[in-house]
């Protein structure tokens, strides 16, 4: 299995840029994070599943009300790993075939179009692991695969202090992954603290639609 990395093309102007990406897998919305992003005007890319969209209309309305801050991208239909062979990853059964990968990607895309009118450009599968052939399938469907370079919250399982430390340590060009669908987990508090620390350092926050992510890449 492949776990692709993603970083921004550096701009040599002495400024530090990072991209915050947040996965909304299923379940609820962590308003500690969402409300802070709005209040502090921190741009972020939110990867949503069709399952999450179905139950989080209020949070979606907040995202849609701030197009200057939030880019909405594709996290799949049912949070099934986009892997075209029958394996289990972190206890989650993978899609298992090319047809099932297409369904996961397209189901997510169609849900985003229906809910927002926007066409997603990026796809991140559940667990962020793929095969080289499933990545080729995703590209063939017109989507780029969104890797990352800093794992902020360890799948939302880390404590607040460790999550904050990971995020605050991000360097120029890093793409951070964390979660925005676990309001009861300590990690969410760490996401907030880590992002505020980056902001205090004068870091510029980018989204995946930034020109720094122009192809070539995934």
Where are these regions (language model features)?
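His/Asp/Glu-enriched short active-site or ligand-binding loop at hydrolase and phosphoryl-transfer sites
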Residues: 119, 129-169, 202-214
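Structural recognition of the beta-strand scaffold that forms the well-ordered cores
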Residues: 18-21, 44-48, 71-74, 121-124, ...
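Generic structural signal for well-ordered alpha-helices
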Residues: 4, 34, 60-61, 102-109, ...
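Non-membrane alpha-helical structural segments and their capping/turn regions in soluble enzymes
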Residues: 95-103, 167, 185-189
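Histidine/acidic-residue-rich catalytic or RNA/ligand-binding cores of hydrolases
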Residues: 82-89, 157-161, 186-192, 217-218
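Active-site beta->alpha N-cap acidic-glycine motif
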Residues: 1-84, 89-90, 96, 107-114, ...
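Acidic-and-aromatic substrate-binding clefts and catalytic sites of carbohydrate-active enzymes
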Residues: 24-29, 48-58, 124-131, 153-159, ...
């Amino acid at each position: 299995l492949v776990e692709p990395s993603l970083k921004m093309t550096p701009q040599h102007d002495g400024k530090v840029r990072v991209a915050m990406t947040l996965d909304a897998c299923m379940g609820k919305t962590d308003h500690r994070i969402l409300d802070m992003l709005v209040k502090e005007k921190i741009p972020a890319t939110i990867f949503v599943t069709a399952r999450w969209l179905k139950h989080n209309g209020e949070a979606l309305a907040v995202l849609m009300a701030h197009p200057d801050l939030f880019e909405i991208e594709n996290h799949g239909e049912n949070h099934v790993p986009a892997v075209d062979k029958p394996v289990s990853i972190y206890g989650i059964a993978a899609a298992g075939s090319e047809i099932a990968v297409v369904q996961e990607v397209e189901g997510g895309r169609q849900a985003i179009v229906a809910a927002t009118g926007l066409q997603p450009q990026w796809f991140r599968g559940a667990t962020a692991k793929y095969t080289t052939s499933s990545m080729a399938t995703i590209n063939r469907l017109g989507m780029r695969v969104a890797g990352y370079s800093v794992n902020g919250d360890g799948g939302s399982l880390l404590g607040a202090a460790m999550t904050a430390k990971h995020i605050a340590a991000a360097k120029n060009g890093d793409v951070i992954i964390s979660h925005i669908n676990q309001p009861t987990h300590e990690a969410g508090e760490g996401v907030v603290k880590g992002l505020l620390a980056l902001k205090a350092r004068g870091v510029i926050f980018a989204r995946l639609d930034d020109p720094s992510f122009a192809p070539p890449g995934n």
